[in-house]
Amino acid sequence: MSKEKILFIDRDGTLIVEPPVDFQVDRLDKLKLEPFVIPALLTLQDAGYKLVMVTNQDGLGTDSYPQADFDAPQNMMMEIFESQGVKFDDVLICPHFNEDNCSCRKPKLGLVKSYLQQGRVDFATSAVIGDRQTDLQLAENMAIKGIQYNPLPTDKSSLNWQQIVKDLTTNPRIAEVVRTTKETDIRVKVNLDETGGNSIETGLGFFDHMLDQIATHGGFQMQVNVKGDLHIDDHHSIEDTALALGQALKEALGDKRGIGRFGFSLPMDECLAQCALDLSGRPYLKFEAEFGRDQVGDLSTEMVSHFFRSLTDTLACTLHLSSTGHNDHHIVESLFKAFGRTLRQAIRVDGNELPSSKGVL
């Protein structure tokens, strides 16, 4: 079963206003939605989140809280949500009092046990949203993010619905990969939403310059530190850097919602570099370039195609890359620049839709 981005959301005091006197929404006239909850939930759904309601209802089904008194406002609330396009995949209710010492009352895990056992929860992106400390404790027990709701937050410890949307949908696209083998020790960090401040040290000056071209023309920040067996040759350092960079880019892209996906051609002096890119989730490279020299600077020209081959393997992209010209320096640089400009188009975020009819990339 594939893991899902799931929001486990409290009801009273989070989705609807909780009456301050008896803390029970047991009549229709007591039903009132929290501010901006519907547009917030719609935006979160569009961002790929599944919605699950998780609520403690003290003594539900007893004389103090008859089932029928609960059902009328609950059904009305669900009808309102559904009429506006908000869909809850599940509604989980604990009917017990605290003193009953049941296994399902929040913050215990009884209500959400099946989600955890079935491996449905993406722990990196899922969250619990609620107005009480018990909701935050539930999040801690589930090992996922906890967000405390407050319609009028006074500090950063709690958020209203508009702030919750921003918090969950504008996470920085950052990834760091460390790759250590007998030949190399490599650290690559990328931030797809920041520019400048690149720091690249591979031990190969011209290769550093080419990686900087990718970051500069790609419009993102890159930090690369490589310690490799350059006393033998440059093969392992270049190959493993490409593998680590591809993996970092893939991780930073996340589920790829809203990205352009596709990309571009670039002239450089007498060269014409052509690059077409699809962040398809499928590795494929078609590379066409001829070099008259074995090296440009301290970079072996035979490693240029191998760099892009290794990068496409871990980035899992389809890449068509070619360049024609007479100056090997220009040919190599045009390839890296063209790839950077193409990548810039492909990773740019414009909306929340997943650019695939399959529903996954």
From Swiss-Prot:
- Give the Enzyme Commission number: 3.1.3.15, 4.2.1.19
Q: What is this protein called?
A: Histidine biosynthesis bifunctional protein HisB
Q: Which SUPFAM superfamilies match?
A: HAD-like, Ribosomal protein S5 domain 2-like
Q: Where does Zn(2+) bind?
A: 94, 96, 102, 104
Query: Where, by residue number, does Mg(2+) bind?
Result: 10, 12, 131
Gene coding for it: hisB
Segments of this protein annotated with the region Imidazoleglycerol-phosphate dehydratase:
173-361
Instruction: Give one GO molecular function term.
Output: metal ion binding
Q: What's a GO cellular component annotated to this UniProt protein?
A: cytoplasm
Give the family per the record: In the N-terminal section; belongs to the histidinol-phosphatase family.
Q: What broad taxonomic lineage does this protein's source fall under?
A: Bacteria, Pseudomonadati, Pseudomonadota, Gammaproteobacteria, Vibrionales
* Active site residues of this protein: 10 (nucleophile), 12 (proton donor)
* Pathway connected to this protein: Amino-acid biosynthesis; L-histidine biosynthesis; L-histidine from 5-phospho-alpha-D-ribose 1-diphosphate: step 6/9; Amino-acid biosynthesis; L-histidine biosynthesis; L-histidine from 5-phospho-alpha-D-ribose 1-diphosphate: step 8/9
Q: Which organism is it from?
A: Photobacterium profundum (strain SS9)
Q: What is its main location?
A: cytoplasm
